[in-house]
Amino acid sequence: VVIEAVGLSDLKRFYDLAPKAATELARIAINQSAERVGLKLAQRAMAAQVNFPRGYFSEIGRSGKPNFGMAYRATNANLEAGIAGRQQPTSLSRFATERGRFVGGRHRRGTPITVTVQPGRVTTFKRNAFFLRLRNNNIGLGIRLKNGEILTNTHGAKLITSGPLKGVALLYGPSVDQVFRTVAVDISPEVLDALTFEFLRQFELRSADL
């Protein structure tokens, strides 16, 4: 999602007064409104829809970037900033109440696993789901399928086709990117208001030097 200077309806008037300063102040306003307002509003809106675990947005993934954050910042040459979320589906184990017990070695295989993807909507796997350790110290939630069985209502379930786990499907919930795109339009007006306010505030602070 992009935050850019075209949202500043009065920008041309300020460019006519002080083009160099207007560019610099627009850059500052875009970056600050994206980081201080856009990110926080989006995280709050996403958390209301999907039960992402605490701290998940700031976790650093294999790409070296956080699961949700600034993709790039505005520069004087390019007056736009980008916000992006992790595009890979989120392991369903992240939404499981018993995940912490598994990490601590206290969860016995075959006992029920409770998953809450959407706040207030709980799904319990009685016996057929289990945690398993994956590469890079990740933890997955899997379910062993019967011959000919097909999964429905999943977000990119991955079927293991060889080895001792052949026939096990790794289960996933929505990606951060997917959820972010559903809330981006709703938060846009407030982000634009913050952008306009910050630009005018910065211009007022600098007006004596122009």
Residue ranges and their predicted role:
Residues 1-210:
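Short, Lys/Arg-rich flexible segments
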